[in-house]
Amino acid sequence: MVAPWRVSVRVCLSHLRCFELRQGLSLLRPSECPRDARLCWLLLGTLPKVVSLCGDVGEGAPDVLSRRRVRCSGAAGAGPAESLPRAGPLGGVFLHLRLWLRAGALLVKFFPLLLLYPLTYLAPSVSTLWLHLLLKATETSGPTYIKLGQWASTRRDLFSEAFCAQFSKLHVRVTPHPWTHTERFLRQAFGDDWGSILSFENREPVGSGCVAQVYKAYANTAFLETDSVQRLGRASCLPPFSHTGAVGGLRELFGYLGNGRKPPENLADQSFLERLLLPKADLVGSNAGVSRAQVPGHQPEATNLISVAVKVLHPGLLAQVHMDLLLMKIGSRVLGVLPGIKWLSLPEIVEEFEKLMVQQIDLRYEAQNLEHFQVNFRNVKAVKFPTPLRPFVTREVLVETYEESVPVSSYQQAGIPVDLKRKIARLGINMLLKMIFVDNFVHADLHPGNILVQGANGLSSSQEAQLQQADICDTLVVAVPSSLCPLRLVLLDAGIVAELQAPDLRNFRAVFMAVVMGQGQRVAELILHHARASECRDVEGFKTEMAMLVTQARKNTITLEKLHVSSLLSSVFKLLMTHKVKLESNFASIVFAIMVLEGLGRSLDPKLDILEAARPFLLTGPVCPP
């Protein structure tokens, strides 16, 4: 279905007058608008018209941008004349100009590095310098290429260990966009009276990444949907009723809520471009906005405020990501003809990365993932996720509870009690194993910056319960107050997740069991049988090397706790790359998550034994279906 778009000539001409030629770089930028918003014009009228003219916005999976070209004349019979897009040539000129300018800038950065690549075989120092230059070029190429570098560093079955080690450092703190853009997004999402919903003490963000930036604010709970209040209560460390005197439940505690939660939308039912470009009013099942009638004209009362984190996408991000993905697809097809890298199937890699970027630039995906994790861990008090506060969830803005906690890296330092370190390490490993083998829903971005620790200061060696008395009118109330929040992990940034199909999950369990049993040849057979692509020309040699690798790793260790799984998996990845065996993307993501968590866990507890911890999960099987 071709999406109808209408933009007047006056709007296009106003965009044309607004832009001037930027000297030196030959880039177009707005003369009156803020510099950081120079890409926003693409969403205002030109890109939707060109897309509707040149490409088919089809129904399908999120990774489908436009699989076939259509002619406007062919769409004439699909509906009445008034539904047809009227796209003039001006939009096409703008889009092609932007594409050529962007392609030229990227070519200037990366083509010299491509020409210098043969020199990396001369000496290791030259290779290190080349990787450093590639890293710097990626850092300055925008959010799409930064995310591509971060994702590539997790695919150790495709890229060298030196490349992955270098690009694992690619965590860039981006200069925050101005407050005016944040205010504009808030107004679009929640109406002109958004100040009645959110209160900001400081307009400076507490963090800024390449995709979004985060503010700390306070939200009025009177506008939360019923289900959000219930999830908020379940996820909170609330004291018993004898402390607060509340007897009416959470509904009275947070205020009466008349409207129930809308049914969650199915993002997979909307095509990629529709989700990115259609106005919020046109989104099927969208809960993107709060009508102005729902928002009172007064400031929120202090008694109804809770601390929240407000994540806001950077302006112009959608247009830039769409443009970069298009250029990546073109580049992957050009580079795919080279014999040395043909086995990588670069177009397929770009499609996998496109799925990841779709999840990153639509914050509704992260909200859904957080709610999914909360359901999976509803009976696990030692793991917590921020609670998305609906209806304050849109494509560009996500409001969630603000979790006061400490980064897990703070507990890697000397002076931290050994028992506390050991507990944190065990919590992390058990959490990951549950995600993999029980839930089949894995947080795929588990670097230390996204893992926080809560309640470490509340641990006490005293087990004695303290009684509390309260004289309420003529009634003596005796209660046992709840202790401080227990030690638990808080996971952030759940925009990227990994799930395995049922056959892949069974294969993963079998591979893990074969590693535990020291059956290296069995590991090789399983990997070859379920590999996404393979140009292995020496199958028997691959099996022999894998058997020697696993056997040698087991021989050098007296007990399983001495076996470093991350080192073993790193060697397995080297072998896969040498024999040109490509893993399925989610399979590789989960293996990499195990490597990261085991490395983090052993930095806290050197005696951590992930294989021993995995035995119950491997023997009992999944509790719930994948």
UniProtKB/Swiss-Prot annotation:
The primary site where this protein sits is mitochondrion
Q: Which CDD domains match?
A: ADCK2-like
Binding of ATP, residues: 206-214, 311
Q: Name one GO biological process term.
A: regulation of ubiquinone biosynthetic process
Nucleotide-binding keyword on record: yes
Query: What is the top-level taxon of the source organism?
Result: Eukaryota
What protein name does the entry list?
Uncharacterized aarF domain-containing protein kinase 2
User: What is this organism's lineage?
Assistant: Eukaryota, Metazoa, Chordata, Craniata, Vertebrata
| Protein encoded by which gene | ADCK2
